[in-house]
Design a protein with these regions (language model features):
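P-loop (Walker A) phosphate-binding loop of NTP-binding proteins
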Residues: 35-37
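Short phosphate-coordinating micro-motif centered on Lys-Gly-acidic
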Residues: 3-5, 87, 95-142
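Phosphate-binding P-loop
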Residues: 22-29
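Short beta-strand-centered segment that lines the nucleotide-binding/catalytic pocket of NTP-utilizing
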Residues: 55-70
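N-terminal pre-Walker A segment at the start of P-loop NTPase domains
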Residues: 1-21
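Conserved lysine of the Walker
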Residues: 42
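Short hydrophobic/aromatic beta-strand immediately N-terminal to the Walker A/P-loop
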Residues: 31-33
């Protein structure tokens, strides 16, 4: 299945509702990549999705490239803003964490390899006009 949706959000409440709808279609294991300008809401979306998977205390990963949270569904939260990504990075840093049921939430990620064996979701956030309105383009490949 491959589907693309476009969602306009005008408030934090709209963002939370978007996350609630997204959570309903995520099938673990899953890779969710997020891209958008600084301050566009990537971390907010990650935190809201993480809460729905039972992880209530995740931090912004800006100073740590990969954070692992153990639970019923393990969460790997990545922030690649300052990272020098190459295939070895994924093999060495990410692959060892992929045990049990898991979800990867990867911010600033335009180069995370797609995995044909799991659900791949790409989220692109576009700041519309400086008023706080954003457009979220979501592509789901299952």
């Amino acid at each position: 299945m491959n589907s693309t949706t476009t969602t306009d959000v005008n408030s934090i409440g709209d963002t939370y509702r978007y996350c609630e709808q997204l959570f309903k279609v995520i099938k673990v294991p899953a890779i969710v990549t997020l891209s958008g300008d600084l301050g566009s809401g990537k971390t907010t979306i990650c935190k809201e999705i993480a809460k729905r998977f039972g992880h209530h205390q995740i931090n912004s990963s800006s100073y740590q490239t990969v954070s692992f949270y153990s639970g019923v569904t393990n969460l790997i939260h990545c922030d690649f803003f300052r990272a020098d990504l190459n295939e070895r990075f994924f093999d060495d840093e990410i692959d060892p964490l992929l045990v049990g049921d898991w979800i990867i939430l990867a911010e600033w990620c335009d180069s995370m390899p797609m995995n044909p064996n799991v659900q791949n979701i790409t989220i692109r956030i576009i700041n519309s006009d400086g008023s706080g309105k954003r457009t979220i383009i979501t592509n789901i490949i299952s």
